[in-house]
Structure formats: structure tokens, C-alpha cells
Design a protein with these regions (language model features):
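Membrane-embedded alpha-helical segments of integral membrane proteins
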Residues: 97-150
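Short, internal strand/loop/helix patches
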Residues: 311-312, 329-348
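Short active-site neighborhood of thiol/selenol oxidoreductases, capturing the structured segment around
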Residues: 254-257, 268-288
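Internal/C-terminal transmembrane anchor helices
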Residues: 154-183
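A short, hydrophobic beta-strand/beta-hairpin element that forms part of a small beta-sheet core
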Residues: 212-220, 351-365
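Functionalized membrane-embedded alpha-helices
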Residues: 13-33, 61-102
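Membrane-interface segments at or immediately adjacent to transmembrane helices
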Residues: 172-266
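Juxtamembrane interface at the cytosolic side of transmembrane helices
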Residues: 88, 289-295, 394-397, 401-433
Length: 433
């Protein structure tokens, strides 16, 4: 009796750990895969913090950004359905044994502000991330020790279909999002976002207070100063840093400013308050930008001139790169300077196109699906792309989940029917015997 109760407790613990891990891995893998460029940028943050930027080849970072989410997603699917019961617990423990010490290092030394384990969908502090990983590691160890208690949801005859479909699904989703844009945009520049509102600190909230620290040298001695005790000119400037003196409310959008390269004027307010349409060609690095659609981009600029819309190219490139881009593409549109990280956050395409009106993001396009002359048959006020389609998010959710759950549901039903058919035939055979 006591053994039976112990067996039941172990079974319950294994089931809880299994489904919690499955949910975390599926969600984590999915949000990483739908934003492969965001995952790539986060991996670069880690690599730079570790000092490996010049040691490892660049293609490894790109490949890792794509594979990491796929592995997590497939692992979650395998755990949920209880298939590959030998290798899956080992893989879970292996992943958590890598991630847990890594997040401890991040929590202690803070080389990156956000671990990126859930992409931009959910942001955790570094210590919260470490705590989460400790719990997941313990759960993985429970599964590894009592993996025989994992009850599969499908039979061995059809579990290969689950395994293959999980991989095929996330592979095509990741490929689509890499070629175009993430199907779910969790960043503050998503379609429907009001950029100006995203920069405001609500009434009653205290903003974060920062303090600038300056490192100066005199007679071989380095010392740190603030603005209040900044020394005389006998000290030589070495470096500076900004620290958080008092944590407060941080708006979703920070450091967003647009400087005209023609005269250095800050035109941020003019663009965000303009009631006319504004096209923003976002190219964080022109020397790395895809120039396969330059003719279409120039046609979009001509279209903007024809109907009186604004058109700016936002970049963080040097003047030399801008002049080279103009020479190679025949670009006549005005260029503006914006922070490199801000541009990467705005759109995951280089270049990409955004349509704004009164500071609200109406549309976003990758360089591979820019609107052409067949879509721009008149003024934007009369065209579908000239409206802010917030409802498309609902259809994206339905599309993504239908393509994932419906085939898996069909496979599960087929497996159930097969089990019943086999059981009935087996019983009939026994009766005849």
C-alpha cells in the first residue's frame, strides 16, 4: 500500500514537471524562432560580453539564433506528448545545466540587461531568470530520474509523426519570419503603437534617475568623479559611464530622436505630430543593407512626392556609407540619423519600411515585400494599406495556433482510433479462440 502511494506521488510530480517544462520550452522556443534577428542580436550581446566576437566566425551566431529556438520548441513538443522518453530528459538537463550557470553569471556581473530567454514577449530581471532556471533544472532532474513514469499521449506507431511535424512547423515559421517580419511583434514599435505615447512617463510615476560618472587620471592615478565634484583641468579624461542612481518608471520607448543630416535639426516632434502620412525607410547599416529592391524604394519615394507624403531614410551609418549608397542606388530622399539599437528595435529588416501617421505605426514591411505599383494605385487615404489594421493580430494568432494544434489534434485522434480498433479486434480474436 505504501509503495502504491509513493508510486502515485512520483507519477504526479513527474506529470507536473513534464507539462511545466513542455510549456516553458514551447513558449520560449516559439518567441525566439519568430524573431530570429532579435535572437541574433541578443546572442551578439552575450558574445561581446564574453569577449568572443573576434574569436568565433559570424555564421555560427546566425546559425545558433535559428537553431536555439527550434531545439527548445521541439523539446517542448516531445515532453508534452511524452515521446523520445530516453533522450528528451537528458537534453532538458543538458540545456538547463548550460543556462543556469550562464544566468548566474549574468545576475552577478550584469553584462547584459535582459537575458532574452523569452525574447521581447516577457522581460525578466537577471535574478528572476536565474531563479526560474534553478526551478527548471530541478524539474529536469526529476524527469531524468523517473523518466519511466512519463506516460506518452500517442502510441509508438505514430510518435514519429509528432516529432517530424513539430520540427517542420517551427522550421517554416522561423523561415517565414526571417524572410519577412516576425508574425507577432512584441516591441514598442508594433503596428498600432503610438510612438509619442510610448515615450511619456505617466503622471504620478517617478522616472529613473541616472548619474554620470567620469574616470580621470592624474600622475598615473585613476579616480572616479561626478558632475558635482568634477576636478580641474590638471586631470586627464579617461572614460565615462552612466549608472542608475534611483530606479523608477521607464517608458517602453527611450532614446528615440531623429536628426536631419542636412542641417542637424531634431525633427522628431515634427514627424510624430504630423497628421500627414510619413514613410520611414529604416536601414541601421547601409553598408550591410539589402539593395535588391532599390528600384522599388525609389518608386516609393516618387509616389510620396506625387501625393505629398513625407519620406525619410533613418540610419546610423557614416556619411561615407550614405554617399556610397546614394551613388549606387540613385537615392534622392533625405537621410536622418537615429541610434543604431533603436533602428534594430524598430524593424527586423535592413532596410525595412514603416508607415506613420500622427506618430502611430500604420504598417511595416520587410525589404522583401515592399508595396509596389499594384498596391499603390491612388492616395493612401483610399487604400487598405493606408489604414491601421490592428485586427490582423487576432487572425495571426488563429493562423499560427491552427497550423500547430489542428494537425497534432488529427494525429492524436488517428492514434486513438487505431488503439480502439486494435483493442476491439484483439478482444474479438480472444473470443473466437
Amino acid at each position: 500500500m505504501e509503495h502504491s502511494e509513493q508510486h502515485k506521488v512520483i507519477k504526479i510530480c513527474v506529470t507536473i514537471c513534464r507539462f511545466v517544462l513542455a510549456g516553458v520550452f514551447v513558449f520560449s522556443g516559439f518567441v525566439k524562432t519568430i524573431d530570429p534577428m532579435g535572437t541574433y542580436y541578443k546572442i551578439l550581446d552575450y558574445v561581446e560580453a564574453l569577449g568572443l566576437m573576434d574569436v568565433l566566425p559570424q555564421f555560427i551566431f546566425s546559425m545558433t539564433s535559428f537553431m536555439l529556438g527550434m531545439v527548445e520548441f521541439c523539446l517542448g513538443v516531445y515532453l508534452f506528448f511524452g515521446i523520445r522518453r530516453i533522450i528528451t530528459p537528458y537534453l532538458s538537463v543538458l540545456i538547463m545545466c548550460v543556462m543556469t550557470p550562464l544566468t548566474l553569471w549574468i545576475a552577478i556581473f550584469n553584462p547584459v540587461s535582459d537575458c532574452g530567454c523569452f525574447g521581447d514577449a516577457v522581460t525578466l530581471s537577471n535574478w528572476e531568470t536565474f531563479g526560474k532556471n534553478v526551478v527548471l533544472l530541478l524539474m529536469s532532474l526529476v524527469l531524468l530520474k523517473w523518466r519511466k513514469h512519463i506516460t506518452p499521449l500517442v502510441s509508438v506507431r505514430l510518435d514519429w509523426l509528432i516529432a517530424i511535424y513539430g520540427f517542420v512547423y517551427i522550421f517554416f515559421v522561423g523561415g517565414y519570419c526571417y524572410r519577412y517580419l516576425p508574425i507577432f511583434d512584441f516591441r514598442p514599435y508594433h503596428v498600432g503603437a503610438d510612438i509619442a505615447q510610448g515615450m511619456i512617463v505617466p503622471a504620478g510615476e517617478k522616472p529613473t534617475v541616472y548619474e554620470s560618472r567620469f574616470i580621470l587620471r592624474k600622475d598615473g592615478e585613476e579616480k572616479e568623479f561626478t558632475l558635482e565634484d568634477y576636478p580641474d583641468s590638471t586631470w586627464t579624461f579617461v572614460d565615462s559611464k552612466t549608472i542608475i542612481k534611483e530606479k523608477g518608471y521607464e517608458p517602453p520607448i527611450q532614446d528615440f530622436s531623429i536628426l536631419s543630416m542636412a542641417d542637424g535639426e531634431d525633427i522628431t516632434e515634427a514627424i510624430l505630430s504630423d497628421e500627414n502620412y510619413t514613410f520611414l525607410l529604416v536601414a541601421h547599416q547601409l553598408n550591410l543593407a539589402d539593395d535588391g529592391s532599390i528600384d522599388l524604394i525609389n518608386e516609393l519615394y516618387d509616389y510620396s512626392l506625387e501625393y505629398g507624403y513625407n519620406f525619410y531614410c533613418l540610419t546610423s551609418s557614416s556619411q561615407e556609407d550614405i554617399e556610397l549608397w546614394k551613388e549606387n542606388t540613385g537615392a534622392e530622399y533625405p537621410f536622418c540619423f537615429v541610434d543604431n539599437i533603436t533602428l534594430k528595435t524598430m524593424i527586423r529588416s535592413n532596410p525595412g519600411l514603416m508607415l506613420l501617421k500622427k506618430g502611430v505605426v500604420y504598417q511595416k514591411w520587410s525589404v522583401r515585400n515592399l508595396p509596389d505599383e499594384y498596391e499603390l494605385l491612388g492616395p493612401l487615404e483610399l487604400l487598405p494599406i493606408g489604414s491601421c489594421d490592428k485586427e490582423s493580430l487576432f487572425y495571426k494568432i488563429i493562423w499560427a495556433f491552427s497550423w500547430f494544434f489542428f494537425p497534432l489534434f488529427l494525429i492524436s485522434m488517428l492514434d486513438l482510433l487505431y488503439k480502439r480498433y486494435y483493442k476491439r479486434n484483439h478482444n474479438l480474436k480472444n473470443e473466437y479462440e
